From Swiss-Prot:
Source domain of life: Eukaryota
Gene of this entry: HBE1
PANTHER family recorded: HEMOGLOBIN FAMILY MEMBER, HEMOGLOBIN SUBUNIT EPSILON
InterPro entries in the record: Globin (IPR000971), Globin-like_sf (IPR009050), Globin/Proto (IPR012292), Hemoglobin_b (IPR002337), Hemoglobin_oxygen_transport (IPR050056)
Tissue expression profile of the protein: Red blood cells.
Keyword Phosphoprotein included in the entry's annotation: yes
Keyword Hydrolase attributed: no
Protein name (database record): Hemoglobin subunit epsilon
Family: Belongs to the globin family.
Record GO terms (molecular function): haptoglobin binding; heme binding; metal ion binding; organic acid binding; oxygen binding; oxygen carrier activity; peroxidase activity
GO BP terms: hydrogen peroxide catabolic process
Lineage: Eukaryota, Metazoa, Chordata, Craniata, Vertebrata
Organism name: Sminthopsis crassicaudata (Fat-tailed dunnart)
Gene3D superfamilies tied to this protein: Globins
Length: 147
């Protein structure tokens, strides 16, 4: 179980309250698909993923990115129960979708990069550390059913 200090919780909730889920989600998922192209195999139904511009402009990538980040928002609301929060999604990704759990870690790292770009000076090293802890906790919660 991940334990967050009061300062970490405050940093996470303060920044998360400013996140544009649609924009940030689409960009994070898009970057994942560009930077780690083998992850595209899970998104065959998304159409044209042939180039960075095609991926970043793809409405299905943007829509799914929003869906992913909306789920991530559940983590922010349930910082003390990440495993429980992601139990059903872990089961879905393990049993039905067969997603390599390493992809959750990759997406978390990409999300931190995107947020750093969006929030610039507000995304201090302390805020980054709190979010890195959160994305690691979410990745572990999503990978829970794999063990």
């Amino acid at each position: 179980m991940v334990h967050f200090t009061a300062e970490e919780k405050n940093a996470i909730t303060t920044i998360w309250g400013k996140v544009n889920v649609e924009e940030t989600g689409g960009e994070a998922l898009g970057r994942l698909l560009v930077v780690y192209p083998w992850t595209q195999r899970f998104f065959d139904s998304f159409g044209n993923l042939s180039s960075a511009s095609a991926i970043l402009g793809n409405p299905k990538v943007k829509a799914h990115g929003k869906k992913v980040l909306t789920s991530f928002g559940d983590a922010v609301k349930n910082l003390d129960n990440l495993k429980g929060t992601f139990s059903k999604l872990s089961e879905l990704h393990c049993d039905k979708l067969h997603v390599d759990p390493e992809n959750f870690r990759l997406l978390g790292n990409v999300l931190v990069i995107v947020m750093a770009a969006h929030f610039n000076k507000e995304f201090t090293p302390e805020v980054q550390a709190a979010f890195q802890k959160l994305v690691t906790g979410v990745a572990n919660a999503l990978a829970h059913k794999y063990h």
